[in-house]
Amino acid sequence: MFVDQVKVYVKGGDGGNGAVSFRREKYVPLGGPAGGDGGQGGDVVFVVDEGLRTLVDFRYQRHFKAPRGEHGRNKSQHGAGAEDMVVRVPPGTTVIDDDTKEVIADLVEQGQRAVIAKGGRGGRGNNRFANSSNPAPHISENGEPGQERYIVMELKLIADVGLVGYPSVGKSTLLSSVTAAKPKIAAYHFTTLTPNLGVVDLGERSFVMADLPGLIEGAHEGVGLGHQFLRHVERTRLIVHVIDMAAVDGRDPYEDYLQINRELTLYNLKLEDRPQIVVANKMELPEAEENLRIFKEKAPDVKVYEISAATSKGVQELMYAIGDTLATIPDKPAVEEVAEVEERVVFRAEKEPDAFEITRDNEVFVVSGEKIEKLVRMTNLNSYDAAQRFARQMRSMGVDDALRKLGAKDGDTVRIGKLEFDFVE
């Protein structure tokens, strides 16, 4: 089964909790705080594996959660950081944030890595909070929650040559005649519903050819599963445009040529500049010669290779022409990269989160914001000292003043995430 797009959930591991502990050895007078820090949570890391060819495994496992860090211990022992969760993906995988639609990573080379969800940092133990005014604090932090999000994974096949054209123009027949690939071939449209790959061996050189499902008018807008098919064209170095010059289905070959190129350009403007070889197929049929003459009159500057994929006439010459053209093209097509391929691990800079905002939910004041909600999750509210520290942090952030301006009075309910408490003047 060929699967080229899936939606999955990823979550970095939570950081370990910091510890509250004090030294009590016999010969260590006034030993002081000795609670260790929690360990770093594991990252979810995607790594390219050339042995994979499809995203089918992700249809059955759609949740990836990295392990959390160890908790801090006594005697200032820090918890161990968790191991990363390594997920292997096929080359050509693009990872997109489902919320923002931002491209997180573009994974193309064997061994290339990208951090998709970062693990949370470990919480600090009480020895981190000791100072001259509070030499024996009973304060520690919970571990920071790991980053979590839904992502869309898209697989764009990496092939040297992509065969494009209307349905039933002979692309699959051509691929099967020059490679060991066995695509389904039948006398009806959309016989090919998934891309087929084959290797063309020319002796001293070879290249990978992809038979892409047929395109129709409106493909750039998704008509006829156009988006699913067109994404695979983006990574090909050379486009081989196959035309049914015999017009078996009654279409005009020249209009077919214009329409397919229009769809490619509308889907991705960069495809307009991608090298292209035009192939007139089905030349064994009687109508083909006259149609080819008319085509050349309308497009005199377009070099056309005449073949019959069914009888193999002209096919060998076409393959050598493709090989010669590939020799003049860079190994990688011009695609929009998220990061340089040489960069083995990709981290994306995070913008500073908004501090907070306050809304009303009936009689409840709801304080929300990434920064304030993270502060709640990392505060050990079972500790009186930690709760007092949290109250001071809220005041310093301006939450108390903002609540008063909105009319909060003593005893009103305030909610931050899952925490509810009474407002105190």
Swiss-Prot record:
GO biological process terms on file: ribosome biogenesis
Needed cofactors: Mg(2+)
Sequence segments annotated as region (Disordered): 118-144
Gene3D superfamilies in the record: GTP-binding protein OBG, C-terminal domain, GTP1/OBG domain, P-loop containing nucleotide triphosphate hydrolases
Residues spanning the signal sequence: none
Enzyme Commission number(s) from the entry: 3.6.5.-
Record key words, sorted: ATP-binding, Cytoplasm, GTP-binding, Hydrolase, Magnesium, Metal-binding, Nucleotide-binding
CDD domains reported for this sequence: Obg
Chain's role: An essential GTPase which binds GTP, GDP and possibly (p)ppGpp with moderate affinity, with high nucleotide exchange rates and a fairly low GTP hydrolysis rate. Plays a role in control of the cell cycle, stress response, ribosome biogenesis and in those bacteria that undergo differentiation, in morphogenesis control.
The protein's name in its UniProt record: GTPase Obg
Organism of this sequence: Brevibacillus brevis (strain 47 / JCM 6285 / NBRC 100599)
